[in-house]
Amino acid sequence: MFTIKTDDLTHPAVQALVAYHISGMLQQSPPESSHALDVQKLRNPTVTFWSVWEGEQLAGIGALKLLDDKHGELKSMRTAPNYLRRGVASLILRHILQVAQDRCLHRLSLETGTQAGFTACHQLYLKHGFADCEPFADYRLDPHSRFLSLTLCENNELP
């Protein structure tokens, strides 16, 4: 049974998974195209960070960064290697979507890579209703970046 916790990023396992996430991004994308946030940036007041646990074992992480009062960005979505293909990413994504709805956000966006190693990520987001979009916030067109967005219904229910 998995438990999702709002996290302060002090647990060593959480810090290690954030570092693993950043390292993985840099292995697949050039540094100028990698937009992963480190622990310090994930502690910004505009970011809410969650961890997923199975007992004492960290299974995954994810974050929601508020861009403005109606637009949020998914950040730092990562499943721990021992938990791949067990539904952790879908679980944290559904949790973040619910939080976005609860906060009355109208749009949720994300930036991810274009390389083959990101295929599972693309499939996850498309399965949950995200669609390709133009760069948002401070992002620019980049052959190493893919931008996706989900418009939440006007009555703020998930589609």
From Swiss-Prot:
Keywords per UniProt:
Acyltransferase, Transferase
Q: Name one GO molecular function term.
A: acyltransferase activity, transferring groups other than amino-acyl groups
* Keyword Ligase among record annotations: no
**Stored Pfam families:** Acetyltransf_1 (PF00583)
Q: Does the keyword Membrane apply?
A: no
Q: Which InterPro entries match?
A: Acyl_CoA_acyltransferase, Bact_Acetyltransf, GNAT_dom
Tell me which residues make up the N-acetyltransferase domain: 4-153
Q: What is its EC number?
A: 2.3.1.-
Sequence similarity: Belongs to the acetyltransferase family.
Q: What is this protein called?
A: Uncharacterized N-acetyltransferase YedL
Its taxonomic placement starts with: Bacteria, Pseudomonadati, Pseudomonadota, Gammaproteobacteria, Enterobacterales
